[in-house]
Amino acid sequence: MRRKLVVGNWKMNGNLAQNKRLLEALVRGLQDVEHVDIAVCVPYPYLFQAQKILSGTNIAWGAQNVAKHENGAYTGEVSAAMLKEFGASYVIVGHSERSDAYCESNANIAEKFAIAKHYGITPIFCVGETLQERESGVMEYAIANQLDAVLSVSGGALLDQAVIAYEPVWAIGTNRTATPEQARAAHSFIRERIAAMHPGAAESVRIIYGGSVNPRNAAQLLSMPDIDGGLIGRCSLDADDFERICRAAC
């Protein structure tokens, strides 16, 4: 049975004082949660702070992006080896906000996925469709293209200990949320697509949902078949909200 995973994506938020209060509140509030894996993905400058506060707790930490290169003349980039030095367990790759703003291709995202795996960091690989793609009836085609880019480069073996996050782009940072049935159908399609190419990986890979999850809808969403947890944006910045979502996943 797949263990649930709840990941907070802080995006470009926080400062040292706010982070300290939030992280310490999460440590206190979640210390008795035993049956859910919990992580926060913080901005690069705060990795050391997260490492310092969260070490020895039941909360892991990670980053929101990684370079596809190991090292070299890539100004502004941060390598997987650097993330590993700060104890990062997870890294988000392919989030729609980055793909849109920085024109990241599926091939580029696949390289980031592979290098994270090479350094022992669990990639959280985001896939999803725009509202136009959903309304045009090509949702599955759009998701399949994103999945196939990684599967063709990495193969099924690299899905071991990886995470896929289904994030309907039209629900990111909005008040719109996929219905539980819409989310379940998308997760089921993703698992079936993986099974068609790499049967051994399909049942073990965790597929989490990201799209305006909040304390009010978390229990219903996270109880659906094939939904193995959540990638939480706005509500991960509030300790009470994030704790309630984590407990809803139990």
Swiss-Prot record:
Top EC class, one word: isomerase
Protein name, UniProt field: Triosephosphate isomerase
Organism (species): Methylobacillus flagellatus (strain ATCC 51484 / DSM 6875 / VKM B-1610 / KT)
Pathway the protein takes part in: Carbohydrate biosynthesis; gluconeogenesis; Carbohydrate degradation; glycolysis; D-glyceraldehyde 3-phosphate from glycerone phosphate: step 1/1
Assigned keywords, A-Z: Cytoplasm, Gluconeogenesis, Glycolysis, Isomerase
Known partners and oligomeric status: Homodimer.
Predominant subcellular localization, coarse grouping: cytoplasm
Catalytic residues of the enzyme: H95 (electrophile), E167 (proton acceptor)
Localization per record: Cytoplasm
Record keyword Cytoplasm present: yes
GO biological process: gluconeogenesis; glyceraldehyde-3-phosphate biosynthetic process; glycerol catabolic process; glycolytic process
Binding of substrate, residues: N9, W10, K11, G173, S212
Gene3D superfamilies: Aldolase class I
Source species, domain of life: Bacteria
Organism lineage string: Bacteria, Pseudomonadati, Pseudomonadota, Betaproteobacteria, Nitrosomonadales
Role of this protein: Involved in the gluconeogenesis. Catalyzes stereospecifically the conversion of dihydroxyacetone phosphate (DHAP) to D-glyceraldehyde-3-phosphate (G3P).
EC number: 5.3.1.1
GO molecular function, one term: triose-phosphate isomerase activity
Catalytic activity: D-glyceraldehyde 3-phosphate = dihydroxyacetone phosphate
Signal peptide from the UniProt entry: none
Annotated GO CC locations: cytosol
Entry's family note: Belongs to the triosephosphate isomerase family.
CDD domains from the UniProt entry: TIM
